[in-house]
């Protein structure tokens, strides 16, 4: 029995196999909707900042002069 997953966009059952051209999506339409959601930043991968943003304030740089050459 083939594995069946739900389309992440419309929840239509999708058979997971070589015949499923757009897996895990049911169609190109759902695939493009998902791509648009990523492009418009409706989805994001959570990451932990490498540095403490509050610590940057303690450096004492003036924003008006920081980016000037």
Swiss-Prot record:
Q: Name one GO biological process term.
A: regulation of DNA-templated transcription
Ranges in coiled-coil conformation: none
* Claim: Metal-binding is one of the keywords in the record: yes
Q: Which cofactor does it need?
A: Zn(2+)
Name the NCBIfam families on file: PRK00418.1
Q: How does it assemble?
A: Interacts with GyrB.
Q: What is this protein called?
A: DNA gyrase inhibitor YacG
Gene that encodes the chain? yacG
């Amino acid at each position: 029995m083939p594995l069946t997953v739900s389309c992440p966009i419309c929840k239509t059952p999708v058979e997971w196999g070589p015949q499923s051209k757009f897996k895990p999506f049911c169609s190109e339409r759902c695939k493009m909707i998902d791509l648009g959601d990523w492009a418009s930043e409706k989805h994001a991968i959570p990451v932990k900042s490498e540095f403490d943003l509050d610590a940057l304030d303690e450096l004492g740089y003036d924003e008006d002069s920081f980016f000037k050459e």
